[in-house]
């Protein structure tokens, strides 16, 4: 499979970087399922560079926050979901070079392939230029996300938030069990079952890795817990029948009583 030159030109413009060695970009876009030099080594390099650049940016932006907050914010910015979003901003999928199997199964849209390609492009830019140029490019890609990110509980992953919620109430931790694995080794899908005593339902979730499936399951449980808590609030707020009867505004007047009062006045 070859890249459409027009798509490649559009991608270069969106990336904001013109390669001195265009073949580096082609390699960064080549999945290992395709023939020829693929992007895994570039991905390894780009992953490390991205982590460093984002860590430094957060270190400078939040001078009073501790290592825990900085780590959670960095994880939020460099996680697969975020990188896949960046890739979609560039319409990266239309430029990926995939093998026949990946092409047929819709690899252009697969989150894991998109995130790997972004990291590979970062590695390619570094080799084609230098760390300062690479840093400036990464910061331009993540500018909006760096502006809005804040330290706090929202940066914790779903499994951590669920664990802290349960521990704070002395409830046993959930159990995660892989109940199915499908696909080839390079393109697997994991199905995880999660149970916790805090809800009656058994949650089933899927992901391209065991970790992602477990995180998705934890997120679903958190959503169910929040839903139950909202319903409990509604029940507490809604006035009962007895409360309405006790309220003078809802009490019917007694005609005979009114007559007695009238005659007394006379």
Swiss-Prot record:
Enzyme class: hydrolase
Top-level taxon of the source organism: Bacteria
Substrates-to-products reaction catalysed: Endonucleolytic cleavage to 5'-phosphomonoester
Keyword Ion transport: no
GO biological process, one term: tRNA processing
GO terms of molecular function: double-stranded RNA binding; metal ion binding; ribonuclease III activity; rRNA binding
UniProt cofactor(s): Mg(2+)
Entry annotation: catalytic residues: 47, 119
Alphabetized UniProt keyword annotations: Cytoplasm, Endonuclease, Hydrolase, Magnesium, Metal-binding, mRNA processing, Nuclease, RNA-binding, rRNA processing, rRNA-binding, tRNA processing
Cellular component terms (Gene Ontology): cytoplasm
Matches recorded under Pfam families: dsrm, Ribonucleas_3_3
Annotated DRBM domain residues: 157-227
RNase III domain boundaries: 8-130
Keyword Hydrolase among record annotations: yes
Alphabetized PANTHER family for the sequence: RIBONUCLEASE 3, RIBONUCLEASE III
Function text: Digests double-stranded RNA. Involved in the processing of primary rRNA transcript to yield the immediate precursors to the large and small rRNAs (23S and 16S). Processes some mRNAs, and tRNAs when they are encoded in the rRNA operon. Processes pre-crRNA and tracrRNA of type II CRISPR loci if present in the organism.
Similarity field: Belongs to the ribonuclease III family.
Subunit structure, as described in the record: Homodimer.
Annotated protein name in UniProt: Ribonuclease 3
Organism whose genome encodes this protein: Colwellia psychrerythraea (strain 34H / ATCC BAA-681)
Gene designation per UniProt: rnc
